[in-house]
Amino acid sequence: MAYPGYGGAFGNFSGQIPGMQMQMGQPMPGAGPNMFSGGYPGYLGYSDSYSPADDSMWTYFTAVAGQDGEVDAEELQRCLTQSGISGTYAPFSLETCRIMIAMLDRDYTGKMGFNEFKELWAALNAWKQNFMTIDQDQSGTVEHHELSQAIALMGYRLSPQTLAAIVRRYSKNGRIFFDDYVACCVKLRALTDFFRRRDHLQQGIVNFMYEDFLQGTMTI
């Protein structure tokens, strides 16, 4: 069954982008070898045969990462800024980089390894393409109704009240900047993942212990 509120494909983007068509199970162009949609919609997996040493991004990642082979939020911010993935948009804020790490921090180290970085990179590229598609005037911002459209294109089926609350949270004077848009995408994905892991019957209903709720939401 389709999961309530969530039906996105890889990278949380199910809308068609001009010149880019994806189906579940297909590798993402330019995202590295053996990279497929896996687990459930919105997440990417790596085959066991994938060797990071074969990827050109491995050298770049290790130049930024610490001796433990991982990056913290400040290192991730520097890495993404130097990579130019934001394009003409403002670089990602430190807070957005923190929640990016939290989204993929499955071992709760507060850091991001190379495979997690690659997964993030794929999601960011998809979200950026989505943003560029709806930012037709190339102003670097989208309007509130365009954010609602983007959320729907990602596969989320949300009530008008929920959409309005999200727009109020991430808009500034009725406009949503790229950094805030990505922060919104990250939180939607992370919180949906947190909820779905506990929704064993896939009915959109979960009972939380108080501390479990805090651990899942305060870290994002």
From Swiss-Prot:
UniProt cross-references to CDD domains, sorted A to Z: EFh_PEF_grancalcin
Organism superkingdom: Eukaryota
Protein name in the entry: Grancalcin
Keywords of this entry: Calcium, Cytoplasm, Membrane, Metal-binding, Repeat
List of residues binding Ca(2+) 1: 105, 107, 109, 111, 116
InterPro entries assigned to the protein according to its UniProt record, in alphabetical order: EF-hand-dom_pair (IPR011992), EF_Hand_1_Ca_BS (IPR018247), EF_hand_dom (IPR002048)
Compartments reported by the entry: Cytoplasm; Cytoplasmic granule membrane
Membrane topology designation: Peripheral membrane protein
Organism annotation: Mus musculus
Gene3D superfamilies: 6.10.140.900, EF-hand
Phenotype reported upon loss of the gene: No visible phenotype. Not essential for normal resistance to microbial infections. Grancalcin-deficient neutrophils exhibit decreased adhesion to fibronectin, and a strongly reduced number of focal adhesion complexes.
Molecular function per GO: calcium ion binding; protein heterodimerization activity; protein homodimerization activity
